[in-house]
Amino acid sequence: SSTAASSAPTAEELCDQQVAEYIRQIEQLQARSEKQLYSIMLSAYSEYMSHPVEERSLVTKVSAVLSKSGELTAAQNQCDAEFAQIMAAMRKTLRENGRDESIADEAEKTYKQKKNALIKELTSQAYSGGDGSGQSGRWLAEHADGNIVD
């Protein structure tokens, strides 16, 4: 019977597995949310491109982006809410197993850094160009399709 007991995962191993699963969920959430935000921005870009060439300007581009601000905010808020749920579950698992919460702190820090970098990147795309070259559209399409190269 000692062989059966030794093959069963220990509480520590189970905790490690749960934490790894939470990290995986966070990564999936971020990938899904990024794709959603890029898609919303791409729809704003399509709206901008639907204007005749002579009407395409940075003002028109920004206006198209602003028309999507509600969608962008809702997507961001949904992502933040899901992230908060995952973090609460991860911290609870760590506490219940007498573990240090530094891995959760690090996950939260990384999430915030990635979120801020994405917001900065999207803002940069929204407030640049407007010259009708299509550079922003190509960039957004690549990211919305998930062909992101780090």
Language model: regions and residue ranges:
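Soluble, non-transmembrane alpha-helical interaction regions
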Residues: S2-D150
